[in-house]
């Protein structure tokens, strides 16, 4: 048996390596994605002040700290038995839209773009962000950099810092939004809508008009029939910041819908000796190993997971593209892993549209941004992370 090691892996957040094992005929027998770093957050957070959790847990990741910060903040809301005022909820969600704008822009153009935009036949040394710039042009590169910065600026204005925000408090946030900052965010969010539309057009022109790409997306090699999980609002539309957790089966039927506080009734974790990452699965289905299908408890999250678990998008332009994706790829749910890139751009458009809605809300500059915490207890918080 022959072993091939790829270490380190590039184009991902964090550290990882891939181990591939070939049989005597030279065919792949097994392949493992290994996460070799021990993080230890679950241990060193024990005994710390609850109020420190949004700041400590945001250090889990430098790319998606907003998700960890906001999940921790929402856990404090329930732990201190306090409901934030509506203006505070809207400001939190607006900051969260900024996070999705910069994260989805980063992922599509920097991490996914080298394969789609540059092309799978390009030499490895060309499949990077510089190759994307060379293929798409310098003007496109400038727009990518600008709108990623816009997302970070929105996060910074509300969160206090673009990376590792510091605004979350039990019962609200640390400061209101000034009219001057509101106008700045409105301009950036409006521009982000146009950028998202442009990004989808680029995807249509380069990917969907190429028969080979579409065949690759639909191919069995990139198909996994799993359960899907996502956060949805009261109408089962995609929501990043709030709502219930919805799970659908591989054929699209609702399997479960529950509050964050009940997550341990539905989700368990499996441990393997070759990786430090725990492997969540649906408790009521059970762990059957690394297999797909309705009898396996494996489920997927992220952009495609959310779109499959929901019944639509809550903004008009994103809804149009949502319907087009399922029509093009043969109905719902879509099981193609490569469709994550299309779903990501649909969410980029939704985040931008939603940011415009929120920043134009008359309550967004209200000074009523925090309610007094109540008696302390236990709390669980959930948000949808971008990846």
Residue ranges and their predicted role:
Residues 1-387:
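Active-site bordering "gate/hinge" segments
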């Amino acid at each position: 048996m022959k072993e091939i090691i790829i270490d380190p892996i590039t184009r991902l957040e964090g550290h990882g390596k891939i181990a591939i094992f070939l049989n005597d005929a030279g065919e792949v027998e097994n392949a493992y994605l290994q996460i070799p770093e021990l993080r230890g957050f679950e241990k060193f957070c024990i005994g710390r002040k609850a109020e420190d959790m949004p700041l400590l847990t945001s250090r889990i990741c430098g790319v998606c700290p907003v998700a960890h910060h906001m999940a921790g903040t929402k856990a404090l809301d329930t732990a201190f038995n306090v409901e934030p005022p509506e203006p505070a909820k809207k400001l939190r969600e607006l900051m969260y839209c900024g996070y999705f704008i910069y994260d989805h822009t980063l992922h599509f153009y920097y991490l996914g773009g080298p394969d789609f935009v540059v092309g799978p036949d390009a030499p490895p040394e060309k499949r990077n962000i510089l190759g994307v710039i060379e293929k798409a042009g310098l003007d496109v590169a400038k727009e990518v950099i600008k709108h990623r910065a816009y997302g970070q600026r929105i996060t910074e204005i509300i969160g206090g810092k673009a990376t590792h925000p510091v605004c979350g408090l039990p019962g609200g946030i640390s400061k209101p939004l000034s009219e001057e900052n509101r106008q700045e965010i409105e301009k950036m969010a409006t521009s982000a809508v146009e950028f998202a539309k442009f990004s989808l057009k680029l995807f249509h022109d380069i990917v969907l008009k190429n028969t080979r790409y579409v065949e690759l997306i639909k191919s069995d090699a990139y198909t996994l029939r799993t359960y899907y999980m996502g956060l949805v609002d009261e109408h089962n539309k995609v929501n990043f910041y709030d709502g219930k957790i919805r799970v659908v089966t591989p054929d699209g039927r609702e399997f479960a819908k529950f509050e964050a506080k009940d997550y341990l009734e539905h989700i368990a974790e499996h441990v393997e000796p070759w990786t430090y990452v725990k492997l969540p699965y649906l408790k009521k289905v059970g762990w059957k190993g690394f297999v797909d299908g309705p009898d396996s408890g494996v489920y997927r999250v992220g952009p495609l997971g959310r779109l499959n678990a929901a019944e639509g998008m809550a903004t008009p332009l994103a809804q149009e593209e949502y319907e087009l994706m399922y029509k093009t790829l043969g109905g719902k749910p879509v099981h193609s892993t490569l469709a994550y890139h299309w779903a990501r751009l649909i969410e980029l458009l939704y985040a931008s549209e939603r940011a415009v809605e929120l920043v134009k809300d008359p309550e967004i500059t209200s000074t009523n941004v925090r309610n007094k915490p109540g008696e302390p207890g236990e709390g669980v918080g959930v948000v949808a992370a971008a990846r």
